[in-house]
């Protein structure tokens, strides 16, 4: 790995931690954050494996510094998968609303609703029914907002990169 990639990864890790843990709303079972923005943009720019690793590192650092409670590795797996999915479907493409629908659906349904709900039921020893409904409502509301925000940030970042010839 080249030095510039290490530096870029470090910057995005710091940005993801800030957006996921500092500028966020956390309750026991529902988290509303903006960390998905930096993970998606990193995936678009650098691909699935780099985005997955960056997201996992950010999750580990964020949980270590700001986590409430005991460390649980399942969420690191989830964050890796989020980064990987965004990178796999969006890297090297001109991102449009249509192209963003599939990865955002996979992230929302498979990772946030199914996998993370499973981690929460294991971690808190609660029934899925006690956790799922609130998470479902949150994800239904956040789904279109996340797509819109990713598109807005992507357009701004790509415009900046073209201007600066990055």
Regions inferred by a protein language model and the residue ranges of each:
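Loop-helix junctions at membrane interfaces
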Residues: 1-166
